[in-house]
Amino acid sequence: MLQFELLATDPASHARRGTLTLNHGVVQTPIFMPVGTYGTVKGVMPRSLHEMGAQIILSNTFHLWMRPGLDVMQSFGGLHGFEQWNKPILTDSGGFQVWSLGAMRKITEEGVHFASPVNGDKLFMSPEVSMQIQTVLNSDIVMQLDECTPYETKGHKTTEAEARKSMEMSLRWARRSQDEFHRLGNPNALFGIVQGGMYKNLRQESLERLVEMDFPGYAVGGVSVGEPKDEMLDIMAHTPHRLPAHKPRYLMGVGTPEDLVQGVADGVDMFDCVMPTRNARNGTIFTRFGDLKIRNARHKADHQPLDPTCTCHACAGTEGVAWADGGRGGFSRAYLHHLDRCGEMLGPMLTTVHNLHYYLNLMREIRESLDAGRFGEFRARFAADRAQGV
């Protein structure tokens, strides 16, 4: 089931505000989806995700198929029961992960033959197999199996002819995914994925042919795959707003806070990216006033929180709770610097909570600005704040 309601639009851009109703709940859009590849957002308890305002998370079909496997998933009634998350989940098809295997895989019209990265077993992924796996996972949003068109391979930039060949196979796989999804009687929602590389004419053709198939929602794939930033922004400016206005639009694997704000202006409703969690584990912190490198020596004795405007557990602590009852203030940059330098696991846990809170709060502020008819003002203030530096 999927219902999308458009609540507001910005007259000066393609930005829009909506609600997305799925089998496991209602999602306010635009939204960022934290990535939980193996059925967990690294280092974060489901309760913490709830508290920071996560409405929907993403998990990975390929990796969950490898481990723990479908028998285990089926015994829990799907991914929600397995990971104890009662809100919506989106699963990607596994196509990007199979593509990432490089020499370990062989792509044919029927699907992808590859060696398991876990134990070397010979395996096969097809549109039908992907739909069967995602049906067992019982994710609220299912993605078609597609071929991720690379920007370049070993220094060779993908030509238009090569991108067309890849796009056309993804379109055939979209139809096969749709047929199998319906055959299985999956009660959730299947999204088609626009491909076409960095070629706008191919993107246009891909989206038109997918729209003819009448998917409940559409994604823009094949971006953030090694292309220069300006080319990614060109595709963002070209493709999302041309998709049907009455259906949700998802930009896959993007990106920085600036990318999210620009993506909303380009008409995107849904985003996912590993950046806030991966960067947190590697010492890069997102704040209202720019990015902070917690490993830098200048933070060794810094008493400030990561972001004085942030209300996350790392920055604000448990405000309003007495010290005797376990209350405390936020953690200092000095303490988080110390945890990082010592390799203590609490360090990346706290920075991950902060970065995810920052992303989710950014999307909340975007939604509020759209509700108030002030998205343009928000964009200007956001850019000025981020340019200040920390």
Curated annotation (Swiss-Prot):
Biological-process GO terms, alphabetical: queuosine biosynthetic process; tRNA wobble guanine modification; tRNA-guanine transglycosylation
Gene3D superfamilies assigned: Queuine tRNA-ribosyltransferase-like
Catalytic site positions: D92 (proton acceptor), D272 (nucleophile)
EC number of this enzyme: 2.4.2.29
GO molecular function (one): tRNA-guanosine(34) queuine transglycosylase activity
Region described as RNA binding: spans on this chain: 253-259, 277-281
Assembly with partners or alone: Homodimer. Within each dimer, one monomer is responsible for RNA recognition and catalysis, while the other monomer binds to the replacement base PreQ1.
The family this protein is said to belong to: Belongs to the queuine tRNA-ribosyltransferase family.
Protein name stated in the entry: Queuine tRNA-ribosyltransferase
Gene assigned in the entry: tgt
